[in-house]
C-alpha cells in the first residue's frame, strides 16, 4: 500500500504544478501584456517587419524591458545592425536584424528580420518554456514596432534551416 501512496502524491503534485503554470500562462495571455496566441510552430518562421523606424536604437529603447526581464530574457546589441535575445536558462537564441535599405521600396522605409537561431528541445520536441520565451520576445518586438510606427507591417515565412539544442534530461 505504501508505494501507491507515494505514486499518488507524486502524481497529485505534478497535476498541481501543471495547473499553476497553466493558470499563470493564461493570465499572461489574457492580459495581452507578455505574449500572443500563435501557431505551435511559429518559432520556425522568419518574421519580417516593414516600418518607418529608422534604426535599432529607437527600437531597443521602445522594448518592454520589464516584461522581458520577468521572463528571464536579456537583449544585447552585439552588432550595429543586430539585437540578440537570450533567456537565462539558455533555452533559445533569437536575433532581430536590420536589413540593408532598398531605395526602390520607398524612402524612409526600413526592414527588420526576427529569427530564432537556436532552440532547446527534449526528445526532439521544443520545450514549452523555450516556446514561451520566444513568444514573449517576439511579442515585445511587435509591440515596440507598433509603438513607434502604427502602420508597421509584419510578414511570416517558414525557414528551412534552424538549429536545436537537444537535451535528454
Language-model segment annotations:
Residues 83-169:
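Cytosol-/stroma-facing membrane-proximal "stalk/adaptor" domains immediately downstream
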Residues 4, 40, 55, 101-104:
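Generic low-complexity segments that are intrinsically disordered, proline-rich and/or Lys/Arg-biased
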Residues 61-88:
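Extracytoplasmic/periplasmic/luminal assembly and interaction segments
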Residues 42, 78, 105-107:
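A generic structural signal for short, non-catalytic loop/turn and secondary-structure boundary residues
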Residues 14-71:
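Terminal, regulation- and interaction-focused segments at domain boundaries
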Residues 43-45, 79, 90:
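Residues that act as N-cap/strand-start positions at coil-to-secondary-structure junctions
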Residues 1-10:
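Feature marks short, highly hydrophobic, charge-poor N-terminal signal-anchor/signal peptide-like helices
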